[in-house]
Amino acid sequence: MNDFDRTSYLDYASAMRHPNNFSNTTATFFTQDADINIVHPFNNASGAQAYFKTVIEPLQTSFEGMYRRNDISMTGKFEGHNWVSSTGYYVGHFARDWIGIKATQQLCYLRFGEFHRMENGKAVESYIFFDIPELMIACGQWPIDIGPGLARGHTGMIHGPASHDGIIQITPDPSEGQKSLQIITDMLGSLATKDEAWRPFWHDNMMWYGPGAFGSFVGIDHFASFQIPFESQFDGWSGGSKSNGLTKHFVRYGEGNYACSGGWPSVTGVNVKSFLGQPPTNEQVFFRVCDWWRREGNQLVENWVFVDVLHALLQLGYDPLPPTT
């Protein structure tokens, strides 16, 4: 990994730690023709200026005093390309409506996760996730009161790593990153198996920080109470680490005791049971997903997950976003 790319990204993150207009910050980090993929309702922006005008500037207008805090930041290589990634929160006073969500006139948090393919210190290809349902739940405006599991998990602000070492600034031993990558690759390949072959990869008291619409869970059995019903709602459930011809990870790498991955889409299956209150369509559904993991020794202890739930629900014929004026 080019340390120049790491420094460039850390500078970008640092510039967003305090309120400013962020236009210069955005223009400096992204190329003018960067391919920027964003969760629904944005979906795509071409270049730094379009991303600023479409996403960042309206968010700043709605969230007074907006700034950004990172909880994890890591770099790595995938298929010969340099990547940087991070997850954390945008923070501000929710003063004006945003994408149809009514302002609360209170402090609000918008969780983000992002990946950038880098060339010469600039982002040329990006995938940016926002947990919009989590914000809507916090504002009392999410219209669905169930999750995909036996019960929706905890909803609320998600913490960074319990070890408080998620911002990696100095390249660690490459063998540790390779170990992290191998563990998550093997674990992902064990999902959706009848014998729950994924269990040995996890600590018994693991933390699964899920998207707001799903909720978060502590302990492997409580996680299973979500994961197994979720898998059963989609026949042929399969993820981006497998060569299924339908989904593919755009990135997957490890650094130190952390690993990350993302797919656009990453998971797919035929919807055969009710999902988030919507009747089955018996059609293929595709999920945009990304993850960060932290391991201790040979087991995964924490997992931060994003799913573009709005995009998934649209495929089922339901739009939970309020109409905009």
Regions found by a protein language model. Give the residues of each.
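C-terminal and inter-domain tail/linker signature
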Residues: 1-325
